[in-house]
Amino acid sequence: MTKWVCTVCGYVYEGDAAPAECPVCHVGADKFKKVEGDLTLAAEHEYGVYAKTVKNNPEISDEDKKYIFDQLKANFVGECSEVGMYLCMARIAHREGYPEVGLYWEKAAYEEAEHAAKFAEMLGEDLEPNMKATTKDNLKWRVDCEFGATAGKFDLAKCAKKNNLDAIHDTVHEMARDEARHGKALQGLLERYFG
């Protein structure tokens, strides 16, 4: 049997010839392409594309390389800041009785986080040398980071408590517990998948 893929919606048909009509998007047989060999993706996201296409590219001037790197990194930092600020604004809106506004801020924050993730993915190890292209390496690294973040936040909470700053103490102490939970969850995943 021959495989035929609809170039409009991706439906795969097996038969001697393409179907007269795609059962999903209803285009004609002319929109089907015979699959030769293995299926391949026309495009996909790639980790560290900056290093692969810009960093050592002799056709790009040093000035443009610096500009591209600086802008990618600045955009990453900006997107991360927006995530925190938008979630803060969502909390304010909810407290003021504007739940729809709060929910939109939360949606926008998630989109900004997606943007930050894409900038991080493009920059790869040029953004953070410990970040790698493999799940195992990233789990190992982040387990250590979460345990460190737990200790750092706990120390800040203790200092706030010593100075009778209850609002700061309570919030940061709860965050320390969140970091501990993250660390334990990531450690469990590391052990489950990578022994």
What are the residue ranges of the model-derived segments?
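Non-heme di-metal
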Residues: T2-G195
